């Protein structure tokens, strides 16, 4: 299992696991013993084995399902970077194993497709019978896209990278064939039949700003951004014209900005661990400073969560006390849902985020396709859908070429050492 699977099981981040198991700093090893706090294990055991699965992949999104007909779905294709085209016939098993171990993209492709296979099997049980083509994107892209299977497909999923995907999108010009970018969300060429299924950073920022405006417009907004995020700071100042901008990173700087009669929403924008760590520590200390028998209420938020918040230098307890709130393209599931149970039974491990992405994207694309047989004409009838860890809400972007961008973003918040969806 990877760190992601362990986090879904036990609610412990990679940095938490490394703190408990210093030998894991260079990665997880096969057959290694891992120490997990009893409280976290007991919570997983009780959830995984005694609770009712909280996700039914055969009965989700009833509105979409009721509008979707199996008769409208005929053929789809996957173009994924398996990178196996150059593997010869000699000692094939060893070569494939080495490719999965030594190459970074091949495991992602196989994980994604393993989740898609569960979705395809589920759809078949729901009465959907259609042709599925699978191609290795490391082959001749022009030859692949000219294949009759691709030309006849109503939906093409992949490739992963922006460069390869844009090449495919430029070669498939038939508006009856929707081309879906499964993982890339930067510099996608949005032709009229192209779908950027992963929300962009700008979309995530906009969704978070809208959430804050809707829920905290009357509260005390505080902006804290380092010198490398001045553009984002200016954007936040325009969005929240009454916000206070803290320039002095100190206890006094925060004390002067905090309001003890309102909730304080501190927008922290930085990718520097020293800056973020100091800000979190000072804000957490401020929670204990009483004025007129009142303690301040502080919510730490960011409109763009970088990897810096995964650092072992940050305390999850402090982030939880500050109700850390941020946008994300995928929420965490706890591994007790019926898809994860079925995946583990099939493959022997819990699904990682790529397997879940493959499942969610396949389910959504096929069910949407079933509404009319053409993805483009479905978007006016079907709004936002939500599956295990991913949302889909497509909006046509006429300014970028007429393609579609996914607006489906989760807003989540740390609460009592759990990450909960608030929007």
Question: Where on the chain are the PLM-derived regions?
Answer:
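Extracytosolic ligand-binding ectodomains
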Residues: 1-11, 15, 19-423
């Amino acid at each position: 299992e990877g760190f992601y699977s362990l986090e879904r099981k036990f609610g412990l981040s990679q940095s938490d696991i490394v703190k408990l198991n210093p030998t894991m700093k260079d990665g997880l090893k096969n057959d290694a013993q891992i120490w997990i706090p009893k409280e976290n294990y007991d919570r997983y055991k009780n959830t995984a084995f005694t609770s009712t699965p909280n996700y039914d992949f055969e009965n989700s999104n009833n509105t979409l399902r009721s509008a979707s007909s199996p008769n409208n779905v005929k053929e789809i294709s996957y173009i994924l970077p398996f990178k196996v085209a150059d593997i010869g016939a000699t000692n094939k098993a060893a070569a494939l194993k080495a490719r999965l171990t030594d190459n970074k993209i091949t495991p992602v492709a196989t994980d994604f497709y393993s989740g898609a296979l569960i979705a395809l099997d589920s759809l078949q049980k729901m009465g959907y019978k259609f042709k599925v083509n699978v191609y290795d994107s490391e082959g001749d892209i022009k030859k692949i896209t000219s294949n009759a299977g691709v030309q006849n497909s109503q939906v093409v999923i992949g490739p992963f990278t922006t460069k390869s995907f844009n090449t495919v999108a430029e070669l498939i010009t038939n508006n009856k064939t929707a081309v879906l970018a499964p993982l890339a969300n930067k510099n996608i060429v949005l032709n009229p039949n192209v779908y950027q299924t992963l929300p962009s950073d700008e979309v995530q920022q906009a969704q978070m700003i809208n959430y804050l405006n809707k829920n905290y417009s009357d509260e005390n907004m505080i902006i804290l951004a380092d010198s490398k995020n001045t553009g984002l700071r200016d954007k936040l100042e325009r969005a929240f014209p009454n916000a206070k901008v803290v320039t002095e990173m100190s206890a006094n700087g925060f004390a002067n900005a905090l309001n003890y009669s309102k909730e304080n929403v501190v927008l922290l924008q930085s990718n520097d661990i020293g800056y973020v760590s100091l800000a979190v520590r000072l804000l957490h200390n401020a929670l204990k400073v009483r004025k007129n028998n009142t303690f301040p209420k502080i919510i730490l938020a960011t409109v763009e969560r970088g990897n810096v918040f995964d650092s072992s230098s940050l305390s999850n307890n402090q982030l939880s006390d500050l109700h850390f709130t941020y946008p994300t393209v995928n929420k965490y599931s706890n591994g007790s849902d019926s898809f994860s149970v079925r995946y583990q039974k099939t493959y022997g491990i819990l699904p990682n985020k790529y397997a879940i992405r493959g499942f969610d994207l396949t389910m959504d694309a096929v069910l949407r396709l079933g509404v009319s047989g053409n993805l483009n004409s479905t978007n006016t009838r079907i709004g936002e859908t939500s599956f295990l860890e991913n949302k889909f809400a497509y909006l046509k972007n006429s300014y970028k070429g007429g393609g579609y961008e996914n607006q489906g973003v989760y807003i989540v918040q740390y609460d009592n050492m759990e990450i909960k969806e608030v929007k």
